[in-house]
Amino acid sequence: MKKFLKYLLVLIILILIAGIVFLFRPIASKQVQTAKDEPVVDAVLVGGGIMSATLGTYFTELEPNWQIRMYERLDQVAQESSNGFNNAGTGHSGFMEMNYTEEKNGKMEIAKAEKVASQFEVAKQFWSYQVKQGVLAEPKTFINPVPHIAFVWGDNVKFLEKRYAAMIQSPLFKGMKFTEDPAVIKQWAPLVMTDRDPTQKVAATRMEVGSDVNYGSITKQLVNHLNQNPNFKLQTSTEVTGISQNDDKTWTVSFKNLKTGKTDHVKTRFVFIGAGGAAVKLLQLTGLPEAKQYAGFPVGGEFLITDNPAITAQHTAKVYGRAELGAPPMSVPHIDTRYIDGKKYVLFGPFATYSNKFLKNGSQLDLLASTNKSNVLPMTTVGLENLDLVKYLVSQVMMSDEDRLNELRKYYPDAKAEDWRLSQGGQRVQIIKKEPGKPATLQFGTEIFASKDGAVTALLGASPGASTSPYIMLNLLEKAFPQQTEGKWNQKLHEIVVSYKQDLSKDPVLLDKVRQYTSSTLGLNYTSPFKAANDETAAAPVAKAN
């Protein structure tokens, strides 16, 4: 027995030593020796998703002569989180997402919903501009009119009524309708009311101007157009393996062709890491001190999906419920109309899954590989402080098919198991951030990372993500290129996004013009709720330059 305990103690000590060695291993890329006369490109985009495609499109419009390179590890672009089946396709506008509004001290706070709604208006303007320029094809190939509905029952009816009363005070939510009449709700969303208990108290709000968006289609179309530019080069099946700074302050991005095994590198003045969940891991390769404050917590999602015409014909809406008390924001249940590659689906979820992968097509070693001496303590602290989240994830992972069907029946009482299949969605990585002098926090939104000189940028986090990609990338341009956005790029940015630098929540006239223009261009449903609509011809509103 003593001998066994001795060996056990030695084993524990060896494991501890190995763990310490692992945590203190160098994670930054080694500097690559490059030739002095080696060409330098203007921008490298890591990842072939909607963020890189959007930023690349901005670049080609603002600087047509820039040399741009895009590297994607899969054999096609838009196959991770941007893929139509890997996300809910919501054009997040704050109309129905009740987690964007909360009641504090008896007052309904709608600022976050206004922020998200304003950002999606930027997205619609960006896409409208691309349609006008012939970059994006027929709008129905990527966006379709789908009303957004918030639906509740029981004790949540009062919450929704208060939410509605607060939201219609903002120009962004003018035109929202509220009802407690089951017959009206059945007209709006028949599936939700079919065979529902007639004694159950229900309520709903509706915004007609809502949309369903295929971000995979947008990504592919933007990249196809970028490929027509001789200054742009896309390499698929290519994994970025290193990002290191050169003595002249440029950066070298090293990569490997996953089909041939060939390695190479490129020198660049600017790097954007738009690799979804893998962004945290890739950012660590830079060795930048400000990158050390980040870690990632991966969470997956599953959806129940049907393409049965008898069901899809009855549902043209995105219906969001309210997350149960104590549940995280990612848990908001919704039953959605989806249009993917010309076919109509109905999707319900999400059901959380857990995996150590940072990408759907990633490795189970991703979480471990991103752990180091700088973030192991914040990760542990956040884990202990968010036991409710851990408990929620465990409960979700333990769900049976019958459990999931019962959840669906809360929103579609007549649902039958044979009509639905379970589909694995994309992988999201929530940010764990430890700022100097502050406690570590788990964040549920998106965050733009920019180095002090703006030469290295990244997008971290998840929701609302793709739906506000044009706004997020515009914000990134401001952080990385402040002089250009205030100077020579300013006029062009106002052409692309007419409301650039304007607060639509405080300018109902401009908001109305913008919505009429984008709805006409994108084929969305919009009837002006403002009595003095200035221009019913849906002409593009005039931009105001700074």
Curated annotation (Swiss-Prot):
InterPro entries: FAD/NAD-bd_sf, MQO. Its cofactor is FAD. Pfam families: Mqo. Pathway: Carbohydrate metabolism; tricarboxylic acid cycle; oxaloacetate from (S)-malate (quinone route): step 1/1. The keyword Flavoprotein applies. It catalyses: (S)-malate + a quinone = a quinol + oxaloacetate. The keyword Methyltransferase does not apply. Keywords: FAD, Flavoprotein, Oxidoreductase, Tricarboxylic acid cycle. It comes from the Bacteria. GO terms for biological process: tricarboxylic acid cycle. Its EC number is 1.1.5.4. GO terms for molecular function: 2-hydroxyglutarate dehydrogenase activity; L-malate dehydrogenase (quinone) activity. It is an enzyme of class 1 (oxidoreductase). HAMAP family: MQO. Belongs to the MQO family. This is Probable malate:quinone oxidoreductase. It comes from Acinetobacter baumannii (strain AYE). The lineage of its organism: Bacteria, Pseudomonadati, Pseudomonadota, Gammaproteobacteria, Moraxellales.
